[in-house]
């Protein structure tokens, strides 16, 4: 039996459209917010969110569409944050005065360190203590080409999920499990943070396709942008991520293992994984270098990975090289602007101290 709850969906980009449609079609009350009032108006004028594609299809009617974040948050049982991870901090500051004890906040996904950053900012803004969850990746493979429409190519079969405090994960899954059975509890948010495969699959391939992105010639990001050599180098970046996790006594999946868990594939290489994934057909590459594959996945992926590696004395030469090359390429000091350990509330902590902070 599906239990009805009220879900706030904050952010109506690709993933937010998919979440709002999915939950409404599951019979849940959906309070949807976006900062862009014009986008909200266009969805209101359309009268619904139309979901299309092999992953999800139907006409969904959220109970509320608003650009007033307080209206969306104050009466929700579960608050789903579905904005680029670089905006998590501002969302936390903006909702701090509206949230109340007993609410569940989930970052979809948290990238690396999302729940930790969110908790720190809520506390700094005087918010009550609430449970903050995060997933390791986005549930949907989807694209919204215009307000009120979303194409859902696939829904992942399983999603790593953890909470702050770590012991609240079971309670959280009791709240959402009837509509989000894909969420599977792992040890803690350090595990979900170190299972951030976007940090492997986005910055490096985009860097190696920079000329193609700037040329304006359309290309399929995964199917054409990740060649055997690009995939092979991504596997070496992935090995550094896994080494960091092992230093924290965490067993996180490799990217290839993640594809098996998420999509039911059994690839031997990253190249095989992307070529064999029908959900990636038609996903276009960036048309310039002002892309979230840099600004989000370097800031909230490579930066905290590099800093976590340094904290536990794990060398990350490839992660550092990609981070620094992209910083120089687009004249952005990601090491300053990104998610540093200080911004996560972990500055100066040992491996044991960091593990304690995520309990």
Curated annotation (Swiss-Prot):
Record flagged with keyword rRNA-binding: no
Pfam families: ApbA, Octopine_DH
Disulfide bridge partners, by residue number: none
Keywords recorded for this protein, A-Z: NAD, Oxidoreductase
Catalytic activity: (2S)-2-[(R)-1-carboxyethylamino]pentanoate + NAD(+) + H2O = L-2-aminopentanoate + pyruvate + NADH + H(+)
Coiled-coil regions listed in the entry: none
Gene Ontology molecular functions: opine dehydrogenase activity
Enzyme Commission numbers on file: 1.5.1.28
Domain of life: Bacteria
UniProt subunit comment: Homodimer.
Job of this protein: In the forward direction also acts on secondary amine dicarboxylates such as N-(1-carboxyethyl)methionine and N-(1-carboxyethyl)phenylalanine. In the reverse direction, the enzyme also acts on neutral amino acids as an amino donor. They include L-amino acids such as 2-aminopentanoic acid, 2-aminobutyric acid, 2-aminohexanoic acid, 3-chloroalanine, O-acetylserine, methionine, isoleucine, valine, phenylalanine, leucine and alanine.
Family: Belongs to the lysopine/nopaline/octopine/opine/vitopine dehydrogenases family.
Protein name: Opine dehydrogenase
């Amino acid at each position: 039996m599906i239990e009805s709850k009220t879900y706030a969906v904050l952010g109506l980009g690709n993933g937010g459209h998919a979440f709002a449609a999915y939950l409404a079609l599951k019979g849940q009350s959906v309070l949807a917010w976006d900062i862009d009032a014009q986008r909200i108006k266009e969805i209101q004028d359309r009268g619904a969110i139309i979901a299309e594609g092999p992953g999800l299809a139907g006409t969904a009617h959220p109970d509320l569409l608003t650009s007033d974040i307080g209206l969306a948050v104050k009466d929700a049982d579960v608050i789903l944050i579905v904005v680029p991870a670089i905006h998590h901090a501002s969302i936390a500051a903006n909702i701090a005065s509206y949230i109340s004890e007993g609410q569940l906040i989930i970052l979809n996904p948290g990238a690396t360190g999302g729940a930790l950053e969110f908790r720190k900012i809520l506390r700094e803004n005087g918010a009550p203590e609430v449970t903050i969850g995060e997933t390791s990746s986005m549930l949907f493979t989807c694209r919204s080409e215009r307000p009120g429409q979303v194409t859902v190519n696939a829904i992942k079969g399983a999603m790593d999920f953890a909470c702050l405090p770590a012991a609240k994960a079971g309670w959280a899954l009791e709240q959402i499990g009837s509509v989000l059975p894909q969420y599977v509890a792992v040890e803690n948010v350090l595990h979900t943070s170190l299972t951030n495969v976007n940090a492997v699959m986005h910055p490096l391939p985009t860097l190696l396709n920079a000329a193609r992105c700037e040329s304006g010639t359309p290309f399929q990001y995964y199917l054409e942008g990740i060649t055997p050599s690009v995939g092979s180098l991504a596997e070496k970046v992935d090995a550094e991520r896994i080494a960091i996790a092992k230093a924290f006594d965490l067993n996180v999946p490799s990217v290839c293992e993640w594809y098996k868990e998420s999509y039911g594939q059994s690839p031997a290489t990253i190249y095989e994984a992307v070529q064999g994934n029908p959900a990636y057909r038609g996903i276009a590459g960036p048309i310039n270098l002002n892309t979230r594959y840099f600004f989000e996945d370097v800031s909230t992926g490579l930066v905290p990975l590099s800093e976590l590696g340094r904290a536990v004395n794990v060398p990350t030469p490839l992660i550092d090289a990609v981070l620094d090359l992209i910083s120089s390429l687009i004249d952005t000091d990601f090491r300053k602007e990104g998610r540093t350990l200080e911004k996560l509330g972990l500055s100066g902590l040992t491996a044991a101290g960091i593990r304690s902070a995520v309990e």
